[in-house]
Amino acid sequence: MIEEEVLKIIKPTEEDKKGIEKVLEIIRERLNKLDFEVEGSFRKGTWLRQDTDIDVFVFYPKDVGKEYLERNALNDIINRIKDLDYTLAYAEHPYVIVNINNVEVDIVPALRVESGDKAITAVDRTPFHTKYVTSHLDERGKDEVRLLKRFMKGIGVYGAELKVQGFSGYATELLIIYYGNFRKVLEEASKWKHPIKIELTKPMKIFSEPLIIPDPVDPKRNVTAAVSLKNIATFSIAAKYYLKNPSIEFFFPSKKVEEKVKGDVLILRLNLDEKSSEDIVWGQIKRSVNKIERALKQYGFRVIDVQAWGDTNNITIAVQLESKNIGQYYLNIGPQYYSQTIEDFIQKNDNIWVGEDGRLYSIKERKEYDAETIAKKNIVLKVKYNIESYWLQNTEDQQIMKFLRKTPTWLK
C-alpha cells in the first residue's frame, strides 16, 4: 500500500531519535534548575523524519504575568544559551530558536497554569495538549497522524501560521483521535460541507468559522479557527481524489512543473530591511494582496489571480491579468432620464449623451491606467523594504511555474 511506503520514508528511526536526544541533552544542561518540559510532536511521538523542530517550554509561576515572560524570562534563557547559534523569534511574545546540528529547538517561556482553560498566553495550554494526545493515541495512532501530516504538507494545507492558514499539528492529532485512522479522516473529509463540527468535547461558546473543533483542554477555543475555507476545500477535494486513485504524489508532489505565461503577469519582489514577526508581516502581505486585487478591478483591469509567497525577508507577489493594456478613457454609465440625479451627473461630466435606452452616458478619463503603478501603491507593508518589479516573459522559477500552472500535480 502507498501508506506503508510513505511511512517507511517519514517515520523516524532509532538513529534519528538518538540524534534528537543528543541535541536535547545540550539544552537540558543549559536550562538546568529551571522548570522546563519538552513538548510538541517529538514529545507526543508524532514527529516526521527530517522535519524535526523541538519545542522546549520553560515555565514560570502564573502570577509573574506576561510582561515578565517578554523581558526577564527571555533574558534569562538567552544568557544560558548565548554561546549557541540562536535567533529571536516573535509570536504572541518573543521566544528563542536554537540551531544545533541542523536541528531547530524553539525555547518558549510560558506560565504554569492549573488547566488549559486557565491559560493566560496561548502557549500555556501546550502541556495539556501533550497530555491529552499521548493519553488518546497508541503507536499505530501516532503513525496515522504522521500520514495525515505528510498528506497535508504535500497538498499545501499544513501549518496554522497566517502565511498558510492551514491545519496545525494538534488539529491533525485530534482528527485522528476523532475518526480513528488516516483513511477514515479522508473518507469523512471528502464529504465535508461547511460549517463542519467535530466535537471531542462540548463547545463552551458559539463559533462562526467553517471548521469547528473545540479544544478538549479549553472548550472556549476552536482549534481550527485559523484554517481558511480555501484550505478546507483543498483538503476535501484532495481526500476525494486520493481515495479514488491513491498516489505518492499527494504526499511528495513533483518538484518540477512547467507552464507557459497566460495573460500578462507582473512580478513584485520585496526585500524587507527589518526583521519582524512572521504573522505580522504576512498579515500585511495578505492585506496587500487583497488591496492590489480590489484596486486593479476598480480601475477596470480584469484580474485572473493574485498570490504571494516567500518568508519574512524575501516575498514575491504575482499579479496575473487578462491584459495589462487598458484604455485611457472609459464609458461612464449615468442615470435614467427621469432620475433626480441627472442634473448632478450633467454638472460633473463632459461628453454627455442620451443612449437608446434613455440613460445618460459620458466619456471619462481614468485616473490611473498603469497596472504596475497601481499594484505598487497598494502594498501596505509597515516595515522598510526594497522592491523590484517586472512583467514576466519566461521563467525557470518553480514557484512562479506553480502560480502559472494553478492545478496541483496531485489533481492532474
Swiss-Prot record:
Gene3D superfamilies: Beta Polymerase, domain 2 (3.30.460.10), CCA tRNA nucleotidyltransferase, domain 2 (1.10.1410.30), Poly(A) polymerase predicted RNA binding domain (3.30.70.590). GO terms for molecular function: ATP binding; CCA tRNA nucleotidyltransferase activity; magnesium ion binding; tRNA binding. It catalyses: a tRNA precursor + 2 CTP + ATP = a tRNA with a 3' CCA end + 3 diphosphate; a tRNA with a 3' CCA end + 2 CTP + ATP = a tRNA with a 3' CCACCA end + 3 diphosphate. CTP binds at residues 41, 44, 129, 149, 158. CDD domains: NT_2-5OAS_ClassI-CCAase. Homodimer. Catalyzes the addition and repair of the essential 3'-terminal CCA sequence in tRNAs without using a nucleic acid template. Adds these three nucleotides in the order of C, C, and A to the tRNA nucleotide-73, using CTP and ATP as substrates and producing inorganic pyrophosphate. tRNA 3'-terminal CCA addition is required both for tRNA processing and repair. Also involved in tRNA surveillance by mediating tandem CCA addition to generate a CCACCA at the 3' terminus of unstable tRNAs. While stable tRNAs receive only 3'-terminal CCA, unstable tRNAs are marked with CCACCA and rapidly degraded. This is CCA-adding enzyme. It comes from Saccharolobus islandicus (strain M.16.4 / Kamchatka #3). The lineage of its organism: Archaea, Thermoproteota, Thermoprotei, Sulfolobales, Sulfolobaceae.
